[in-house]
Amino acid sequence: LQLFHPEYDVQGVGKMIMEAGIAGQLAAKAKAANDVEEAEKQQKICDELTKGAYAKLHHDMQHFVTEASVEQLTAIKNSIAQCARKAQKAGIDAIEIHGDRLLGSLCSTVLNHRTDNYGGSLENRTRYALEVLQAIKEAAPSMMVEYKLPIITVNPDGSLRGKGGLLEDEAVEFAKMLDAAGIDMIQVAQANHTGNMGDTIPPMGAVPYNWTLGACEKVKAVVHCPVATVGRVVSVEAGEKILEDGTADIIGYG
């Protein structure tokens, strides 16, 4: 979830994508009925809507971010809780809170410059994430809840890799908070929010294999819930060794 500048019409994009899907279905039905003219007409509508939606989405998000109001944050939290409630009703067993994106932006000292209860101290910056967790647990008490914990890592030259998340020491402290709040599982991952795909999917040789494992091990040492690692774990053998060494409980391959 992101909040963009007012002219970035997120709902409008969603409507365009939905209408493109409908037009695509109508085109397929017309083609199946050998109605070439109608099929071409609907396919053209589908293509134009899809192109327009992607054009609106294709930009650097950082240039469009605004500070979310408390009212907006509350509305988003309530929507997330409603989604969790519906998921539980549908028979879903587990839900992952993606700790990057909006939550990671609020946690991050790089992106969060607020001066209210959601900015400044670690307690304030992580407040919203914990509120979201609590809202989900209240809305869907029988669901297993995982938190994807993004770590801002440090490159060999001292520069930061990733923006939306927490530096390692703060991430370990936040993991304790999540554990105390009743999280069922934590996945330690690389933070992103940089606009550079190479930060989260680094070029071959740019970072070592299993490069988030050190942070994962530190998190695992302070919590009681299972902890997963992800980040250039590319073979079954590597994953098995991590499990045998006890540095993580679950492996995210890739």
Give the label of every model feature segment:
Residues 1-253:
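Flavin-dependent oxidoreductase catalytic cores
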